[in-house]
């Protein structure tokens, strides 16, 4: 049980309590997301399809620069918070998305790894200017009430993973693959429907689904303890698990278009490459979700 875990687990539990307390703040408005989902695609209005394409582009940029999943998760949070409040025209989505991404990068990444705005725009292949980006950044900040930091599903995923791992014998602590869980969360972020889930519920749904596949009783007990502590109903968990399962099945199929950093490769000229740090133009393909070891 969580109540009798190790000292390290108690520290993790304290962090979890803090996240749970803050969770409801700085989240997208569900009613606004539903409006986007119901919008018809006429080339002018914001739609779920356009939003999802934009998030895939942000994921490509995240991989291109080698940024953390936490940065991507925060960028998606900022984007959805803004889109759920504002009526954004399709032609402005690229500028909005890149502004949210840049805010997340400056908030999470080390200063030495933050690219110049000019480089970010060039590599993203957009035609707007740095001034346009800065103006949009200010608008985004105003609409999110200058609250860039937010509780994300990635933070819950990290904590839940660490808590469950603490309950395992040392020799079995690598049974649950965090890289695989991260890849699954990234795939879910690329679907607007998952932004309607509470971050804690989405994170636990991803882990619970993975643990079901592992068929490891001790891990299942850990999930049940966390579910109870986080006050997540069985109905909610099952609902989102089913949606996650469907998403990952589609993501693994050839029908799903995946983010691709390759399209960014050609835009980096020799001159630009010399000006950028090595990590800036190191392309990493979006990995397929690692197979479960068994």
Swiss-Prot record:
InterPro entries: Cyclin (IPR039361), Cyclin-like_dom (IPR013763), Cyclin-like_sf (IPR036915), Cyclin_N (IPR006671). CDD domains: CYCLIN_CCNG1. GO terms for cellular component: cyclin-dependent protein kinase holoenzyme complex; cytoplasm; dendrite; neuronal cell body; nucleus; perinuclear region of cytoplasm. Induction: By doxorubicin (DOX). GO terms for biological process: cell division; G1/S transition of mitotic cell cycle; mitotic G2 DNA damage checkpoint signaling; negative regulation of apoptotic process; response to gravity; syncytium formation. Keywords: Cell cycle, Cell division, Cyclin, Mitosis, Nucleus. It is found in: Nucleus. It comes from the Eukaryota. GO terms for molecular function: cyclin-dependent protein serine/threonine kinase regulator activity. The keyword DNA damage does not apply. Pfam families: Cyclin_N. Belongs to the cyclin family. Cyclin G subfamily. May play a role in growth regulation. Is associated with G2/M phase arrest in response to DNA damage. May be an intermediate by which p53 mediates its role as an inhibitor of cellular proliferation. This is Cyclin-G1. It comes from Rattus norvegicus. The gene is Ccng1.
